[in-house]
Amino acid sequence: MEANAPKRKEARKSLRIKVISMGNAEVGKSCIIKRYCEKRFVPKYLATIGIDYGVTKVQVRDREIKVNIFDMAGHPFFYEVRNEFYKDTQGVILVYDVGQKESFDALDAWLAEMKQELGPHGNMDNIVFVVCANKIDCTKHRSVDESEGRLWAESRGFLYFETSAQTGEGINEMFQTFYSAIIDLCDNGGKRPPSSMGVGFTKEQADAIRRIRNSKDSWDMLGVKPGATRDEVNKAYRKLAVLLHPDKCVAPGSEDAFKAVVNARTALLKNIK
């Protein structure tokens, strides 16, 4: 071989990763995986019994990835089975049904279960999470809007995608972004790069939007007690207006929350002499 012969570019090392799916029963976890891996939709619901395991190879950027997917049953009955599979995970697919508010509300419980099983030495900050707001094809029955789901995900530094296992909408984009983030994780020594954790808004802003969305009346929305004075109402309003003004807050749902606060103040001041 000649001394000046060009060297072949060395292929980047392939990766082997572990991914798990989490979420309540019947939210479409298995259907999302089948839609991506097998390019098909299974219309008949077949409950996952314990754990469904599969292996697939994908090419993302210039890397070959061997993915071990553990599709975990969502029914509480299978807790004793799935609790063995949380450890040594690089990626988590969190799924809820946009037409079932209870499946969205249960996401916190799923995270708590995982944290408990990982133990005191487990670090969930070094796992890539993607939240799938699934079944968006069923828009007539939607009970969790996009801004609410996106706020929950992004306030935790999670990826967020609107998906439909039935039509395939959002599925490929979700997996490609998910796997790309896991590559960055592995290339960064098993730690999420700092840039992937920035969300552009504060926890205080996210909490305020959630409280406003779930408030039962105008008093509750502004955080004042019934019978509050005009000055107390205006003070509470000014604090929220500064916090949530659309020009200063990029959190999902901030514009609607700001409008709701303006309307709440107007309604309360009409009845205060």
Curated annotation (Swiss-Prot):
Cysteine pairings via disulfide bonds: none
One Pfam family here: DnaJ
Main location: nucleus
Gene3D superfamilies: DnaJ domain (1.10.287.110), P-loop containing nucleotide triphosphate hydrolases (3.40.50.300)
Subcellular location: Nucleus
Binding annotation for GTP: 23-30, 71-75, 134-137
Gene Ontology CC: nucleus
Record GO biological process: intracellular protein transport; positive regulation of ERK1 and ERK2 cascade
GO MF: GTP binding; GTPase activity
Record keywords, A-Z: GTP-binding, Nucleotide-binding, Nucleus
Record-annotated J domain positions: 217-273
PANTHER family: RAS-RELATED PROTEIN RAB
Described function: GTPase possibly involved in regulation of the MEK/ERK pathway.
NCBIfam families given in the database record: small_GTP
Family: Belongs to the small GTPase superfamily. Rab family.
Protein name: DnaJ homolog subfamily C member 27
Organism: Gallus gallus
